Amino acid sequence: MNIIEQIEKEEIARLTANKTIPAFAPGDTVIVNVNVVEGNRKRVQAYEGVVIAKRNRGLNSSFIVRKISSGEGVERTFQLYSPLIAGIEVKRRGDVRRAKLYYLRERSGKSARIKEKLVSKAAKAAQ
C-alpha cells in the first residue's frame, strides 16, 4: 500500500468516526441530511430522492440523488465523506439491474417508478 492510499484510509477513518454511513445502492430512496449555513445560522436540510449513481473511489467517493421538486427534476451530487453531510438514511430499497440509472432523466410518472426490493427469508433469518 503506498503512502497516498494509507493517508486516504486514515482520513476516511477520521471522518467516519462520529457518523455511520449505511450501505446503499443505485435505485434506493435515501434521505440525506445536509448542514446548511445561512448567514450566521447553521441548520440541517433534508434532501430525499432516488440514488441514480454511486462512484466508489475511496476518499473521493460520491453519489447522485435525483428528486422531483414542483414538477421539475433536480439532481444533486454529494461527496460520501463530506463533513457537510450530517447523516444518510435509507428509506426504501430499490430493485434495479443497472449501476447507473441515467435513463430516469428522460422518464416521468409511472415509467420512472422503481420496483421495491423484497427481503428474502434467508436474509430475515440472518437478522
Swiss-Prot record:
Keyword Transcription regulation: no
Molecular functions (GO terms): structural constituent of ribosome
Any one cellular-component term (Gene Ontology): cytosolic large ribosomal subunit
Keyword annotations from UniProtKB, A to Z: Ribonucleoprotein, Ribosomal protein
One annotated GO biological process: translation
Keyword Chloroplast recorded: no
Known function: This protein is located at the 30S-50S ribosomal subunit interface and may play a role in the structure and function of the aminoacyl-tRNA binding site.
Family (UniProt): Belongs to the bacterial ribosomal protein bL19 family.
Record's protein name: Large ribosomal subunit protein bL19
Native organism: Cupriavidus pinatubonensis (strain JMP 134 / LMG 1197)
Gene this protein is translated from: rplS
